């Protein structure tokens, strides 16, 4: 079944209809030689087993063979998850440990996703853009090229409340730490959003905004550009 992931209601339907998954990894010491491992990925040497699969299938094996099991340890990082995580092996970008990126996103060349950052379904991260520590890019949020999304900043998504227009951050924008860009807002090219600002209306190109709600305080000048320049070495 196909879904139009530009529509928040279609995204919600996709999540609703997706098969929910609770994958686990089990380390087992015992005799499981007579078990049926259909649909389970198994690695073993002698009485040592590592099993990857859905919890309901692995837990059945453990319960039925508990008298043959000496030791068991289970690792789990999600429950009834609807959307898988992105296969990062296919991405030519720097993605640090602890970043959470859902499937069906676009990550541009030489982008940087830092520890603790969250990128939700349908989001687009442009070439050379950095999503700093603990920043959030909500569903369908669009970040252009060479954007810096500061630590703890939020680009709101389209899901709750539903919004037909995603947040759009154009090229060469700098968003300071802990700033919040509300649903459907557009930030024009080259603009700067000061740390801690709450942006409730569209921002034109090449201006600096600050405050809650954010207001234009000046145009971007040479001094501003020098203070907010990006470091190419971080994107190599």
Swiss-Prot record:
The UniProt record lists the keyword Nucleotide-binding: no
EC number, as in UniProt: 2.3.1.89
Pathway: Amino-acid biosynthesis; L-lysine biosynthesis via DAP pathway; LL-2,6-diaminopimelate from (S)-tetrahydrodipicolinate (acetylase route): step 1/3
InterPro entries from the UniProt entry: DapH, DapH_N, Hexapep, Hexapep_transf_CS, Trans_hexapeptide_repeat, Trimer_LpxA-like_sf
Keywords attached to this entry: Acyltransferase, Amino-acid biosynthesis, Diaminopimelate biosynthesis, Lysine biosynthesis, Repeat, Transferase
A GO MF label: tetrahydrodipicolinate N-acetyltransferase activity
Catalytic function, reaction form: (S)-2,3,4,5-tetrahydrodipicolinate + acetyl-CoA + H2O = L-2-acetamido-6-oxoheptanedioate + CoA
Domain of life where this protein originates: Bacteria
Gene Ontology annotations of biological process type: diaminopimelate biosynthetic process; lysine biosynthetic process via diaminopimelate
Family to which the UniProt record says this protein belongs: Belongs to the transferase hexapeptide repeat family. DapH subfamily.
Stated role: Catalyzes the transfer of an acetyl group from acetyl-CoA to tetrahydrodipicolinate.
HAMAP family: DapH
Protein name: 2,3,4,5-tetrahydropyridine-2,6-dicarboxylate N-acetyltransferase
The organism of origin for this protein: Clostridium botulinum (strain Kyoto / Type A2)
């Amino acid at each position: 079944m196909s879904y139009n992931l530009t529509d928040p209601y279609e995204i919600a339907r996709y999540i609703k209809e997706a098969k929910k998954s609770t994958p686990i990894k089990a380390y087992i010491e015992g005799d499981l030689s007579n078990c049926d491992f259909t649909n389970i990925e198994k690695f073993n040497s002698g009485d040592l087993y590592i099993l990857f699969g859905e919890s309901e299938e692995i837990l059945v094996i453990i319960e039925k063979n508990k008298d043959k099991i000496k030791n068991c340890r289970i690792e789990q990082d999600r429950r009834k998850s609807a959307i898988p995580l992105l296969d990062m092996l296919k991405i030519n970008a720097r993605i640090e440990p602890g970043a959470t990126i859902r499937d069906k996103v676009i990550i541009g060349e030489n982008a940087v996703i830092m520890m603790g950052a969250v990128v939700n379904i349908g989001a687009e991260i442009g070439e050379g853009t950095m999503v700093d520590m603990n920043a959030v890019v909500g569903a369908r949020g669009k970040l252009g090229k060479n954007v810096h999304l500061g630590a703890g900043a939020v680009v709101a998504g389209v899901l709750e409340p539903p919004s037909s227009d995603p947040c759009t951050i154009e090229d060469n924008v700098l968003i300071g730490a802990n700033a919040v860009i509300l649903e459907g807002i557009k930030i024009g090219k080259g603009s700067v959003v000061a740390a801690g600002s709450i942006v409730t209306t569209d921002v034109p190109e090449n201006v600096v905004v600050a405050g809650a709600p954010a207001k234009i305080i000046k145009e971007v000048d040479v001094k501003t550009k020098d203070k907010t320049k990006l470091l190419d070495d971080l994107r190599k």
